[in-house]
Amino acid sequence: MTQRIYLFNPDNDLALAHGGGHYIAPPFAQKMQNDLCALPMWYAEPGSMVLVADEAMREWVDSTSERLGFTIKGITPDSLAKANDASFCPWGWSGTIKKRLIKRGVKAHLLPSDAAMEQVRLLAHRRNSIAMHHFIQERTSLPLSPVPVEYDDFNEVLDFATKHPGSYIKMPWSGSGQGVYHAIEPGTIEFERWCKGALKRQESLLCEVGLDRILDFALEFKCENGKAELLGYSVFESDFHSQYNSGIVGSKQHLYDIIASKFPPLHDITPTVTEAVSHIYAANYEGFLGVDMLLYNDGGTTKLNPCVEVNLRATMGLVTCMVGEHILPKGTVGRFKIEYSKSGFPVLQENRIYLTPILPDTHYCAYIGLG
């Protein structure tokens, strides 16, 4: 029987932006990856394994799994070469993670081809979110946000940002608020330098009008055998630059009710979004995928941005979705956060469920705050 092995590589968006297979994450990103490497255990299939940094983390995964009645086991990097009949499920696929696994001794035939990795990179380009927007717009009468525009010339970007103060300028390969410029003052040298640098590296930029935000949420999917399966919903908060801040943890029904209370047509739009994901992504991609969406105020009317971005990978929203549905006691609601502490975490706080191990050298942790 094929053994499924999950792994956490949160730098995958940056690896896709870099291209090729030689991206090296900065030290802080490597540290975060090591400290939070157990996160996939919360959405991994029963009987699978999670790649962790060392023996101490493996013991934490095994003991936590046993305590909760899971059948998840940890595996350390030095054991990967022995996985002769395994399928790998990284946080996200790229040429970089493929090369890292091969370097650890994983047989190349167990991994996707280089052509498949290039296909993933092309699908991760933000212009496919424009295709999503058009697909949904053609199949609904609901009022939706303006469709983003892609430009390959700085003057066109500047003209757009000048006409639409507060717009968002986005690099084609980026995610979770990274590679995004909130253009409050587009006439500055800083704005010009950022845009021209991004155009040189990634050849185009996507421009979106700023919206009066009401609620950030996402639909979480799994793509398999050419079809997209809706796993659930996530509701989260983002900062001024659209970077993920925290997420609500609760049952699938509770999260649905939060969104539907502000946007009753959620029931009608969800099948259309699912169809769009199947049509645009699932034919050439297998794995997790999140569609970030936005409710916004337009002159007193609540409207929908149906595709702020598509994350072609697992997401923190997937973690909150699965934990809320399968881990928290019925009726319990919490808030998911990732915390950094330069001095570590010598004292575990009450009213927290820690989703990653706290060890003497831990500086990043993921937890659910209760109460």
Language-model features and meaning:
Residues 30-43, 51-159:
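Conserved N-proximal alpha/beta basic substrate-recognition cap immediately N-terminal to
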Residues 133, 161-182, 201-213, 291, ...:
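ATP-grasp fold ATP-binding core
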Residues 147-148, 166-191, 217-218, 240-258:
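Glycine-rich phosphate-binding loop of ATP-grasp-fold ATP-dependent ligases
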Residues 165, 188-244, 295-307:
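Phosphate-binding site of ATP-dependent enzymes
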Residues 201, 243-303, 341-342, 346-350, ...:
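A long amphipathic alpha-helix within ATP-dependent nucleotide-binding catalytic cores
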Residues 221-275, 311-337:
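ATP-dependent carboxylate/phosphate-activation module, predominantly the ATP-grasp catalytic core
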Residues 285-345:
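C-terminal structural cap/anchor segments
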Residues 328-371:
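Peripheral (often C-terminal) accessory segments that flank ATP-dependent C-N-forming ligase machineries
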